[in-house]
Amino acid sequence: MIWYPYQQMKTMKEPYHIVDAQGVYLYTRKDKLIDSVSSWWSVIHGYKHPELNRAIQEQTERFAHVMLGGLTHEPVEKLSQKLEEWLPGDLDYCFFSDSGSVAVEVALKMALQYHLNRGSRRSKVLSLTHAYHGDTFKTMEVGDDPDYHGILREKRDVVHIPTQVEELERVFAEQGETFSCFIVEPLLQGAGGMRMYDVSFLRRARQLCDQYGVLLIFDEVATGFGRTGHR
């Protein structure tokens, strides 16, 4: 038996049985479906892309995976260098993880450790209403989904605010020196209802985070790879 994600086994609908995929399409034995969510945002370039398939095949003929615990290799070094060239400012270090939830967990841990290393015990996290950042425990806590995660709502070290500059300024004025980080899905909240907000909010968030020594985390699992515009 398979326990499918986000499903109650007694009430779930029969899943589509996929036998092939090409581009944006998924195929059952009799139907052709459009994958409008890119397999939860991960199949960015479509299925069976010839250049990607060729690169994967060439790499697996050498090795499919080598951990980075005390080891390194050319593909990860090349990717790190390319990301450093593309990313703005002084974003010069890359930490690799295996899922969106884990990437967010690592970012939150780094923020807490950063303040500990500076002699501060800041532990609060600022987040947005309607936020979604994953389904591990801490990412569920910083998300804003009472239907799924109500058991965690009694936690007091996460503050949620709407995407309004006035509320942003108010919460920083009142609690800014207690926040370790502010985590956002930039410009578009995906799983929270495809909610878009103005870039002026992000610009003000950057200013206030710098003013109060708060780290700003962009969760771009759903918005990266140019989905919100040109870099």
Model-derived regions, located:
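Active-site-adjacent loop/helix segments that line or gate small-molecule/cofactor pockets in enzymes
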Residues: 1-24, 62
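Glycine-rich loop-to-alpha-helix module at the N-terminal edge of alpha/beta enzyme cores
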Residues: 5, 32-118
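PLP-dependent aspartate aminotransferase-fold enzymes
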Residues: 81-180
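Short acidic, glycine-rich surface-loop motifs adjacent to enzyme active sites
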Residues: 178-193
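Catalytic PLP-binding core of fold-type I/II PLP enzymes
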Residues: 195-228
